[in-house]
Every structure is written in structure tokens, then in C-alpha cells.
Amino acid sequence: MLKSINHICFSVRNLNDSIHFYRDILLGKLLLTGKKTAYFELAGLWIALNEEKDIPRNEIHFSYTHIAFTIDDSEFKYWHQRLKDNNVNILEGRVRDIRDRQSIYFTDPDGHKLELHTGTLENRLNYYKEAKPHMTFYK
């Protein structure tokens, strides 16, 4: 039986740039650095960075694949401004109904998509039940 997510690992082209991003911008706690690796605790998760300089990264922006972190509604403006102030690549995101809460989509220095979201799974399911009758829901 799966218990939980153990860790998330990102391939990065420049370890120092990524350490700066995850520590100084996203406020992750740096736990370990090595020649080509760094570990963080971020939002209760183990985030691992492994430097791999020769990995193609040009098509990653076409995918909707991303990792979302929860933030409070009251912190939305703070985080949006923090990302802007640090010249983070903020993405336009999708058009969203306010019942689906607020999100900020952005990328790390290697183009990995991240999201800061103010909603919960329960919020999303309730919104979809109300607004999307074509969907099938299971218990």
C-alpha cells in the first residue's frame, strides 16, 4: 500500500541557481548540499535537486504538468508580489472561475511548472459538482 509521497526530485541545470530559488524565493529549508545535489524541506515535503547539465529542457513549457503548493487566501498578494520582486517567470495561467479559488503559476530556473493555490480538493470537488454536470463523481 502506498503511504505518501516520499520525495520530489527535479533535474536542474545549475545547482546554485536552483538553491537560490528554492531557499531564498520559496523559503524552503536547505538540509544538504553536495557536488551535484541539494535537499530541501518545503511545505512538509522532501525536495531533491540533482544537477544534470546536458538534459534538453526546451519543450517543458508545453506541458500542464506541475506541482501545486497550498497557500492561504490572505497570502495570495504577498506571494504574487514576492515572485514578481524576484523576477520569477510568472505564467498567465488558465481562465478560472472564482469558485475554483486563486492560483499563481510560475516556473523555477529550469522551467519546472509550480503553482501556489488557495483552494483544497474539497473546494474543487464542490465547485465541479455545482458547475460541471457532465462530470462523474465517485464515493
Swiss-Prot record:
Q: Is this entry keyworded S-adenosyl-L-methionine?
A: no
Q: Which cofactor does it need?
A: Mg(2+)
One GO biological-process annotation of the entry reads:
response to antibiotic
Instruction: Give start and end of each VOC domain.
Output: 4-119
Q: Which UniProt keywords are present, listed alphabetically?
A: Antibiotic resistance, Cytoplasm, Magnesium, Metal-binding, Transferase
GO MF annotations in UniProt: magnesium ion binding; transferase activity, transferring alkyl or aryl (other than methyl) groups
What does the record give as EC number? 2.5.1.-
Active site (catalytic residues)? 115
Report the SUPFAM superfamilies cross-referenced here.
Answer: Glyoxalase/Bleomycin resistance protein/Dihydroxybiphenyl dioxygenase (SSF54593)
InterPro entries, A to Z: Fosfomycin_Res_Enzymes, Glyas_Bleomycin-R_OHBP_Dase, Glyas_Fos-R_dOase_dom, Metallothiol_Trafse_FosB, VOC
Superkingdom is: Bacteria
Listed PANTHER family: FOSFOMYCIN RESISTANCE PROTEIN FOSX, LYASE, PUTATIVE-RELATED-RELATED
**What NCBIfam families does the database record attribute to this sequence?**
Fos_BSH, PRK04101.1
Say which family it is in: Belongs to the fosfomycin resistance protein family. FosB subfamily.
- State the protein's purpose: Metallothiol transferase which confers resistance to fosfomycin by catalyzing the addition of a thiol cofactor to fosfomycin. L-cysteine is probably the physiological thiol donor.
What is this protein's record name?
Metallothiol transferase FosB
Q: Which organism is it from?
A: Staphylococcus aureus (strain N315)
